[in-house]
């Protein structure tokens, strides 16, 4: 079966004379041969400024990397912007900056949601790469492709795939690295709606340009193309060959699940995960697996398919189960919203948490406690609030802005005091400031709802005074209860 992918693509080459470069890619190539737009920009800076930057470039790059590591968003963006005109940003720093931006927006808005500011910054990085071709490594293109895909910007990812393919001949001849880049480009083209023939050209290039040395990537391409374009016979043979060849990586699993789920093949994605002899070396990232669980639940409105994946992880990679536990607990609340059966939800959560407490590898995170606070709100049961606090104390967990948002939501529906509410609010302000996020209307309205939802509190007058103080601070006005 090892030569299976090569056989498929040799047929494609014979039938369509497939080549990587077509008119679109030839047009895109001019982006990389045109003179850099910044070629004369540095002359607008004084000689002293230019000399200072040259002498201190390593220190400035270190400062930028330190700011990213500390998650100082405002400072990072400012430092990056100040360094960009001098052309001293190296490939590794650029790659870290892309991941810094995208991971932050995914943390705030979830997968598939992007704000205009982040999108503008990504587009700006792409322009920088066009002007400074030396930073456009294979890893750079892969990160750019994955970023736009994670943000569901498939049309843009498809365009970047064309750019990366046109740039391929300028990259160092490392077959494994280039093979993976071809797979990322194929992923983007499939999700961008490319035809079977267009996808086949990329698959053919893996064999043709890399001289048949990347068998696993060839097989992955066959598996993706023939699953999406619904040739079950070839798809099954490709999958069997991949399992037998034992060369899959976590990167491949991420790509396969991303393509299948985004093309509506959620059950095939779950089947791939469970039936490919995956282990800690080639399981998808936990971020991708959590996303798959969410999409499986949306497709089946049941926790059962999720629990089979959870049990698989428990057997082959128990170190990852905390994130999966958090996801399943959160989705159990969506199940409750459908069933409206408090006893069923309570029994499931209690049984599930008890099961996890017997697993020695299970180490709750602050997200686990946050989820318990959310459960307390949904079920209007103070015992889950207490369970969350106990977990924070027992495991020494560090609360985040999400923790205090969740607490304020819980205090809307459960017995609460002015002291509890004011402490949660002050901590929320502090945590938001620490990650360079301003207090927005949604936070103000959450505080209003929290205080106005229980007019019969014993200390409601103190609550109203606190609310007016906060509203005055942010220039807001009280809304009628």
From Swiss-Prot:
It comes from Schizosaccharomyces pombe (strain 972 / ATCC 24843) (Fission yeast). It is found in: Mitochondrion. GO terms for biological process: mitochondrial gene expression; regulation of translation; translation. PPR repeats lie at residues 137-172, 365-399. This is Pentatricopeptide repeat-containing protein 8, mitochondrial. Disruption phenotype: Exhibits growth arrest on glycerol medium. Keywords: Activator, Mitochondrion, Protein biosynthesis, Repeat, Transit peptide, Translation regulation. Its main location: mitochondrion. One of its GO terms (cellular component) is mitochondrial matrix. InterPro entries: Pentatricopeptide_rpt, TPR-like_helical_dom_sf. Mitochondrial RNA-binding protein involved in mitochondrial translation. The cox1 mRNA is one target but it is not clear if ppr8 has a single or multiple targets. Pfam families: PPR_3 (PF13812). The lineage of its organism: Eukaryota, Fungi, Dikarya, Ascomycota, Taphrinomycotina. It comes from the Eukaryota. Residues 1-55 form a transit peptide.
């Amino acid at each position: 079966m090892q030569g299976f992918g090569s056989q498929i693509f040799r047929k494609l080459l014979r039938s369509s004379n497939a080549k990587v470069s077509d008119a679109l890619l030839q047009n895109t190539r001019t982006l990389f041969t045109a003179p850099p737009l910044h070629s004369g920009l540095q002359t607008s800076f004084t000689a002293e400024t230019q000399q200072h930057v040259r002498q201190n470039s390593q220190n400035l790059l270190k400062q930028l990397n330190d700011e990213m590591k500390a998650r100082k968003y405002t400072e990072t963006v400012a430092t990056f912007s100040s360094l960009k005109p001098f052309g001293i940003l190296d490939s590794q720093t650029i790659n870290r900056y892309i991941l810094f931006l995208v991971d932050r927006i995914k943390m705030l808005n979830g997968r598939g949601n992007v704000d205009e500011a982040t999108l503008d910054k990504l587009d700006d990085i792409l322009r920088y790469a066009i002007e400074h071709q030396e930073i456009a490594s294979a890893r750079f293109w892969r990160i750019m492709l994955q970023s736009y895909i994670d943000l569901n910007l498939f049309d843009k990812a498809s365009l970047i795939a064309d750019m990366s393919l046109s740039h391929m001949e300028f990259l160092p001849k490392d077959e494994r690295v280039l093979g993976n880049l071809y797979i990322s480009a194929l992923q983007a083209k499939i999700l961008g709606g490319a035809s079977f023939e267009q996808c086949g050209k990329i698959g053919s290039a893996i064999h043709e340009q890399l001289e048949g040395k990347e068998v696993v990537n060839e097989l992955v391409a066959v598996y993706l193309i023939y699953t999406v374009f619904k040739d079950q016979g070839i798809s099954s043979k490709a999958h069997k060959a991949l399992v037998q060849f034992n060369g899959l990586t976590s990167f491949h699993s991420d790509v396969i699940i991303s393509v299948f789920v985004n093309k509506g093949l959620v059950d095939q994605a779950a089947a791939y995960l469970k039936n490919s002899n995956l282990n800690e070396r080639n399981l998808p990232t936990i971020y991708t697996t959590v996303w798959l669980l969410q999409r499986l639940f949306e497709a089946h409105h049941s926790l059962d398919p999720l629990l089979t994946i959870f049990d698989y992880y428990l057997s082959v990679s128990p170190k990852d189960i905390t994130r999966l536990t958090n996801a399943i607990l959160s989705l159990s609340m969506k199940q409750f919203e459908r069933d409206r059966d408090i006893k069923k939800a309570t029994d499931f959560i209690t049984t599930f948490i008890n099961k996890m407490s017997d697993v020695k590898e299970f180490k709750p995170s602050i997200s686990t406690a946050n989820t318990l606070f959310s459960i307390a709100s949904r079920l209007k049961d103070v015992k889950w609030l207490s369970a969350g606090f106990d977990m924070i104390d027992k495991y020494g967990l560090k609360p985040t802005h999400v923790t205090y948002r969740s607490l304020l939501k819980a205090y809307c529906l459960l017995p609460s005091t002015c002291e509890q509410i004011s402490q949660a609010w002050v901590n929320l302000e502090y945590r938001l400031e620490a990650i360079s996020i301003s207090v927005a209307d949604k936070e103000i309205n959450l505080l209003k709802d929290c205080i106005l939802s229980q007019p019969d509190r014993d200390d409601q007058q103190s609550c109203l005074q606190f609310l007016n103080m906060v509203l005055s601070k942010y220039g807001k006005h009280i809304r009628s209860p």
